[in-house]
A protein has these predicted regions:
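Structural signature of hydrophobic alpha-helical transmembrane segments
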Residues: 15-29, 74-89, 134-146, 201-207
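Loop-centered beta-sheet repeat module
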Residues: 47-97
Length: 230
């Protein structure tokens, strides 16, 4: 968010080299829940799997609207914020009211993972990278670096042990592609940058989908080697 704010302050809403503040903030405030869930089953524990409920808050335009509104980059009406978050809150409440219902859904998690992978792969196009250009590639790398690598070291510091699940946050969710248009509906002044921001976010989605499943394994192997030496 600070990176997007600095980009806007220095170069305005059109950004630099085609990389717009709207695209940056959208990409880094939306993660891919399907990738995180799959990686949590392999590299994490029950707390990591359960964290997806909280991480779902950044799936969609809510946090992007909060970031843009609080930094003054956009004027977001309260009703738009409510429309973005209320359905998710209702779903979280309903999912926690019935313990049997909760168990039913939790047991089905393993069945969902292969289908999540199929859907992710079917909707990932390398042509998207070409369309997004250098801006989309750079945005994907920024997302991995600023949300993945930094979160890895933060998680490791808090838990006092190497935690590869921090890298699983460094993704851009597929539904983030629709966020620039959603934000522009709340603040029409952003309409001129919606097209380029959408293409860049789509490019970042593909780049992070490729890198994110690889990097947690790399950090996990590196941590294991260090433990063996000690």
């Amino acid at each position: 968010v600070l990176l997007g704010l600095g980009l806007n302050r220095l170069f305005g809403p059109m950004g630099i080299l085609g990389l717009t503040p709207l695209a940056v903030i959208t990409a880094v405030t939306n993660s891919n829940g399907a990738i995180y869930t799959a990686l949590a089953k392999e590299f994490g524990d029950n707390t990591d799997v359960g964290a997806i409920a909280i991480l779902s808050l950044n799936d969609g335009p809510f946090l992007t609207m909060i970031a843009l509104g609080t930094t003054g980059l956009a004027k977001i009406p309260i009703l738009s914020l409510a429309a973005a978050i209320v359905p998710l809150i209702i779903g979280m409440i309903l999912g926690n009211l019935d313990e049997d219902f909760k168990m039913l859904l939790s047991n089905g998690l393993a069945m969902l993972l292969p289908f999540n992978g199929f859907v992710l792969g079917a909707n990932t196009s390398l042509f998207t990278i070409a369309k997004a250009g250098a801006g989309g590639i750079v945005l994907g790398l920024i997302t991995v670096l600023f949300t993945g690598v930094l979160t890895y070291y933060l998680y490791s510091l808090i838990r006092r042990k190497p935690d590869p699940m921090g890298m699983a946050i460094g993704t851009t969710g597929g539904n983030a592609v629709a966020v620039p248009a959603s934000v522009a509906m709340a603040d029409p002044s952003l309409e001129p940058v919606v097209g380029v921001a959408t293409a860049q976010v789509a490019g970042a989605d593909v780049i992070t989908a490729i890198l994110s499943p690889i990097l947690p394994g790399f950090f996990a192997r590196r941590a294991a080697k260090r433990q063996q030496k000690n």
